Amino acid sequence: MTLLIMITLTSISLLLAAAETIPTTLDGPFKPLTRRFEPSLRRGSDDLPMDHPRLRKRNVSSDFPEQIALALSTPTSMWVSWVTGDAIVGKDVKPLDPSSIASEVWYGKEKGNYMLKKKGNATVYSQLYPSDGLLNYTSGIIHHVLIDGLEPETRYYYRCGDSSVPAMSEEISFETLPLPSKDAYPHRIAFVGDLGLTSNTTTTIDHLMENDPSLVIIVGDLTYANQYRTIGGKGVPCFSCSFPDAPIRETYQPRWDAWGRFMEPLTSKVPTMVIEGNHEIEPQASGITFKSYSERFAVPASESGSNSNLYYSFDAGGVHFVMLGAYVDYNNTGLQYAWLKEDLSKVDRAVTPWLVATMHPPWYNSYSSHYQEFECMRQEMEELLYQYRVDIVFAGHVHAYERMNRIYNYTLDPCGPVYITIGDGGNIEKVDVDFADDPGKCHSSYDLFFFNSLNLSN
């Protein structure tokens, strides 16, 4: 069962699907509410098997695109990404040749009439482990094509692939967002995080798609490939735990491909923006981290002046989003801090009145799970968000929904952001139920699996 949360920013009110009235921040601080949950009823589900119909490879030929995804670049351009070829798992793996197949996107404003064509780049990556028993992995060919010249609030039809094979996808369509303006907003923005690939994940994503978002934001912890249980929820707690003497935990990389297939009905039609979580770190013996995440997702890093795709920003109508990286340097002498300060200083609130930040771990959290885990990041960056009057901060990591009063430095402040922890998107770890101290500080609802939906107007 999934709970849909609607946040209407005209009144900055939060309505739960349950028939209960929750105070708004419009009239200042409100008396905190907590709905208790019986821990014995805590629900979860096992990982979906790799041969599940929504996870397995469906194309007859590996030349045909799969795992198709859209991501915003600028207000008039969009990234189209997909995968071809077959990933390889084993002791000795040889990477595929990215130049062996083209990266093309045909697109236009009429069905079957593609007036515009663009070419892009392709890459592969490997996840390598030195220990006996652990499986190396090399990916399929990952394609990224930037399509531009897009008109706002317009439906486009597209196909992607290699026309010379020929191996082009079926026709798919998407609708562009409005240009940055105080008078124009995406009709609905969906926030979700901590997804994984369980039956609860399917419930969350199906419910999200039924609500027809025009933009999706995933606040980290996507595939849980590092915790995949090859025999479901039984036996060892993760794939590589069968090898206790290994110097490094392996992640089961085929779950990334399964996740891409699972998400394609959504990501191929709705631009989906991501930020990394702790489950995306995936360290290799060489010290490389975030390899899968970095190669698979196209994000507007360079477009927003960032030197890393682990943090970036973008506009969606009258909203400016900053996507913050919690697992890279965030101190006030570092590159991310300097980028954030520069980015926020350029925001014109007359054009984008709403300023929203996202990150994976919450700074404010009353649950025992991850309690004050990122206090150092808060101390480094919170003042900057407060100075530039960020309106809302969305986070995941803690598998329970929670919304704070406006706050700054642990003090109620009418100029501080509203902090929202999105809740559990359905992963294998289940929901969090224990508080760090006596409950009652803020509204909590944690017996269900979540995504959040944001409707905006000035």
Swiss-Prot record:
Substrate binds at residues 278, 397-399. GO terms for molecular function: acid phosphatase activity; metal ion binding. Specifically expressed in flowers. Optimum pH is 5-6. Keywords: Glycoprotein, Hydrolase, Iron, Metal-binding, Secreted, Signal, Zinc. Its cofactor is Fe cation; Mn(2+). The keyword Glycoprotein applies. Binds 1 Fe cation per subunit. The keyword Hydrolase applies. It comes from the Eukaryota. GO terms for cellular component: extracellular region. Pfam families: Metallophos, Pur_ac_phosph_N. It catalyses: a phosphate monoester + H2O = an alcohol + phosphate. It is found in: Secreted. It is an enzyme of class 3 (hydrolase). Belongs to the metallophosphoesterase superfamily. Purple acid phosphatase family. This is Purple acid phosphatase 23.
